[in-house]
């Protein structure tokens, strides 16, 4: 009905979505969560380096989607998702002249690269296909790709708020009981200005250290305050107020433990 009312042959092209965050991992997580919510067959593209340092475009898909994406060389046959990971790490040749140079550029590309560019272009032009990309910022992306993804909507993802950090630490504590003895209020305050990914990584490193220490001593050792604060400090900028406080608390806890040891020896 909308097509006839508006006098269009088909639904307009859906904007490509670019998830941007100073922490590239956070942008990727939000993008992949969106992929999960959509529940459509998805193909992922990302740039990696070979052992020789040569950039290489890697294309992958879930095994369950293989049959639906078998004819992908000819474009999406139905609804789907094209995921472009860390687009700011992709490089493209500089093209000064627009129309006459594009043909020369495409001819010079390898067959695989041409197919990848054509697939992206077909996905952008297909209203049944969602194109999702992640990057640290829009400005960090090569203009070749921003033009290729037009129309493009940028979704800015900032660092987590205090409320979000509280939810993150609650989520970590639910999965890892050994961390529950550390004050959540302190963790929320001292993890300010950290990306979500760094918070999870700091917690995981502290949990793994406590686990290994328990294996050595042959007993259960929960995650200590000193252990977790030390891991958080490793992710905080050296000139931040949070780093200074974490450093002070770690030294204070260490000094207190030495005092307890002296009392036992004495």
Name what the model sees in each region:
Residues 1-185:
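Walker A/P-loop NTP-binding motif of AAA+ ATPase domains
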Residues 178-179, 200-205, 251:
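A general structural signal for short secondary-structure boundary/capping elements
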Residues 128, 177, 181, 199, ...:
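Residue-level signal for secondary-structure boundary elements
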Residues 2-11, 25-30, 218-266:
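C-terminal engagement/docking regions of AAA+ P-loop ATPases
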């Amino acid at each position: 009905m909308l097509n006839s009312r508006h006098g269009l042959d088909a639904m307009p092209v859906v904007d490509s979505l670019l998830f941007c965050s100073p922490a590239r991992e956070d942008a990727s997580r939000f993008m992949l969560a969106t992929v999960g919510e959509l529940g459509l067959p998805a193909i992922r593209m990302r740039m990696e380096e070979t052992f020789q340092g040569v950039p290489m475009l890697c294309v992958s898909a879930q095994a369950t989607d293989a049959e639906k994406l078998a004819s992908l060389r000819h474009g999406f046959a139905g609804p789907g998702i094209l995921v472009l990971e860390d687009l700011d790490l992709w490089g493209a040749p500089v093209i000064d002249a627009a129309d006459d140079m594009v043909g020369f550029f495409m001819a010079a590309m390898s067959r695989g690269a041409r197919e990848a560019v054509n697939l992206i272009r077909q996905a952008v032009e297909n209203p049944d296909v969602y194109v999702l990309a992640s990057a640290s910022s829009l400005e960090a992306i090569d203009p070749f790709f921003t033009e290729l993804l037009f129309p493009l909507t940028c979704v800015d993802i900032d660092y987590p708020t205090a409320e979000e950090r509280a939810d993150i630490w609650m989520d970590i504590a639910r999965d890892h009981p050994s961390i529950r003895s550390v004050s959540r209020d302190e963790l929320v305050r001292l993890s300010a200005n950290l990306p979500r990914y760094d918070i999870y990584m700091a917690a995981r490193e502290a949990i793994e250290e406590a686990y290994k220490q328990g294996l050595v001593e042959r007993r259960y050792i929960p995650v200590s305050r000193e252990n977790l604060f030390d891991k958080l400090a490793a992710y905080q900028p050296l000139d931040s107020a949070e780093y200074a406080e974490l450093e002070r608390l770690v030294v204070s806890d260490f000094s207190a433990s030495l005092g307890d040891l002296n009392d036992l020896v004495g």
